[in-house]
Amino acid sequence: MSDLAREITPVNIEEELKSSYLDYAMSVIVGRALPDVRDGLKPVHRRVLYAMSVLGNDWNKPYKKSARVVGDVIGKYHPHGDSAVYETIVRMAQPFSLRYMLVDGQGNFGSIDGDSAAAMRYTEIRMSKIAHELLADLEKETVDFVPNYDGTEQIPDVMPTRIPNLLVNGSSGIAVGMATNIPPHNLTEVVNGCLAYIDDENISLEGLMEHIKGPDFPTAAIINGRRGIEEAYRTGRGKIYIRARAEVEADAKTGRETIIVHEIPYQVNKARLIEKIAELVKDKRIEGISALRDESDKDGMRIVIEIKRDAVGEVVLNNLYSQTQLQTSFGINMVALHQGQPKIMPLKDILVAFVRHRREVVTRRTIFELRKARDRAHILEGLAIALANIDPIIELIRRAASPAEAKASLIAQAWELGSVATMLERAGDDAARPEWLEPEFGIRDGRYYLTEQQAQAILDLRLQKLTGMEHEKLLDEYKELLAEIAELLYILNSPERLMEVIREELEAFKTQYSDERRTEITANTADINIEDLINQEDVVVTLSHQGYVKYQPLSDYEAQRRGGKGKSAARIKEEDFIDRLLVANTHDTILCFSSRGRLYWMKVYQLPEASRGARGRPIVNLLPLEADERITAILPVREYEEGRHIFMATASGTVKKTALTEFSRHVSGIIAVNLNEGDELIGVDLTDGSDEAMLFSAEGKVVRFSEQAVRSMGRTATGVRGINLQGEDRVVSLIIPRGEGDILTVTQNGFGKRTAVSEYPTKSRATKGVISIKVSERNGKVVGAVQVDAADQIMMITDAGTLVRTRVSEVSIVGRNTQGVTLIRTAEDEHVVGLQRVAEPVEDEELDGVVKVEGEVAEDDDAIDDIDGDDDIAEDDE
């Protein structure tokens, strides 16, 4: 024990950790996780293919047990577990993993549903035909060989591949402190890119991308957008979005829609995808799906998603794209080993490295073939000399006492050149001369001196070779070798010819293995201005109390006489009702203010378009709302102009003014106003800094004051008092009056009135205000107020989902302190909950006759009777 203790050497643990971890990290980076830029293979892939090659497990020979290959790999080349090696083999044999499979498998090698492959003792493999292109010319000293892990075997340091495999099949791996994720590409496109680079070494990225369009995945699908592709090709890093190929089919008889998915994104597990969709439907996070099934078979993939009758297929599909792996992102990180060091490789750098590798391989192959050709020519040269001097040589051999004496005599004597002189004169005296040949051998002083190898070949010559026909064959072979040597020398001495050879081989390779692109590349909102494709039109945007949002063309609604029954604006549940309604243009931005005082952005055209009877789509599926957060106010904005403000009012009477430019950066969820407990936003509007504001309360009060009484504040401020409310009273409407016009006020029970703006006096901020309309049992509380002109129309909506549109001109102008007239007939327990002004009314020829309603027809006189009989119009009285 004491002897052992004396052998212990103290070391600094910090230094030892640094050194050991660095050794481990470099071992993982260089020897395990990252591919070589030249052949696109990691060490384990290289060792598997080499072991199969040594084993003779070729594409045109019988399959061999996977376990046999795995045993050879871990026994000779890869000192790791058999499971890691077998998993590598399995992946190289899966048509959904590699764009061009390198292993031809027989048996169960797993599925796109995530099923595991059968054990290695059950499956059989052999190299695929294209895999041989990675090992082509390996025996011709084209690459360096290095010792295996125990020094008993030699393995290639890199494959002499004819395939730009790093791009063709891609690669992924996680090393220490770095990772790589290179997508597969179409072989034809990549080869065309290589050829374009060979033709013009200064080709731009744009020029290369004319040939290499983008990744081409084995599972096909669709790449959304080219920007991520270009960024990755330019810098080596980028992100692309892969979307499943799906189509919405409609039944001709029932009209019900069905989503059919034919292709899914790369590396997505189909079974888990279907489970996720089912889970989202069960949790009601995705609406509108009635059935889901997998009808995939040997003929291809087919996932069927049946849509409910009242749902819109495109909306459901977009929801699936956003919440499931029907759309995924692929982060491209093109890291590979370049000259033994990890490096981020843009597209052109990868092509340059591959072409440079091919140049080296072809050069080394040419040198090898030249050496072999010269060695063979050297022997044939000696045989030709023997045939030219056949009689003296036969006599010499007959006189020799032994083969050794005969060989020595052949070497010692000088011989006539014969026909060899003419051939060598054409090719050059040194053309076929091996580099190892000593000066005293070969042609010297017009005579020929044989080497030991030539003398032995002459002694081994069979008598039948002495016939005239065999003599001619020998000379013809020698001539062909001289021509081959001349061509090989031309390749070595001419860089242009060398690149021609590389080009010819790439062309031949492309002809043999080319195929069509599978993955479609489409433009998306990041590449084109989607607004250029959206028709500008005015639409009605509705948001229900339970958060269902939609828009529909304004033209869907026909103007009616006041007192009409109205048309249903939305199909809603009994416990739901329309909470917010506004008119906007499809190109406007909707600023969505939440109950928590946060602001979210959406373009109007990004909202779901639905029919008048449809519920729309939950806004929580469109905006990243937090738990218990709901949208309480929405405002359309076209441009973020300097000098303009957003003026906000809360139910408790607080007002706040913030510069519009502070909301121009579209980051969802930023704070718009700091709300007190129990308070909420009831209105927002745009101002120019010199406007006035009017706050209307549920108890019929109104205060009008100058906007300048409210200073501009930051987004996170709470605001100041706008009106002094009494008791449980709350603010229901905010109006920023424009011009003269009138104020139209509506109560819960469908009554309302029109009063000139000038009737409302301007007071100080934070006062109790004056009467806006009489609140009574007949009228109910105030629902809202809007500013109107005589040419306008108004929309009113009830908590039962009924909407009526009527002309403002049909509502009489009365004083401020009055009860008003009937604007909409409400059923028992039905109340008006929303009011909106509509400009530029649509002409309706039927309005001059009978009022058009759903379910019944009422004469005009019935609607007018209420004015003469029941309405109480009183003078202005504060």
UniProtKB/Swiss-Prot annotation:
Domain of life: Bacteria
Pfam families in alphabetical order: DNA_gyraseA_C, DNA_topoisoIV
EC assignment: 5.6.2.2
Motif segment (GyrA-box): 560-566
Keywords tagged on the record: ATP-binding, Cytoplasm, DNA-binding, Isomerase, Nucleotide-binding, Topoisomerase
Catalysed reactions, semicolon-separated: ATP-dependent breakage, passage and rejoining of double-stranded DNA
Subcellular location: Cytoplasm
Signal peptide: none
Topo IIA-type catalytic domain residues: 34-533
EC class: isomerase
PROSITE patterns hit by this protein: TOPO_IIA
General function of this protein: A type II topoisomerase that negatively supercoils closed circular double-stranded (ds) DNA in an ATP-dependent manner to modulate DNA topology and maintain chromosomes in an underwound state. Negative supercoiling favors strand separation, and DNA replication, transcription, recombination and repair, all of which involve strand separation. Also able to catalyze the interconversion of other topological isomers of dsDNA rings, including catenanes and knotted rings. Type II topoisomerases break and join 2 DNA strands simultaneously in an ATP-dependent manner.
Name of the featured protein: DNA gyrase subunit A
Species for this entry: Pectobacterium carotovorum (Erwinia carotovora)
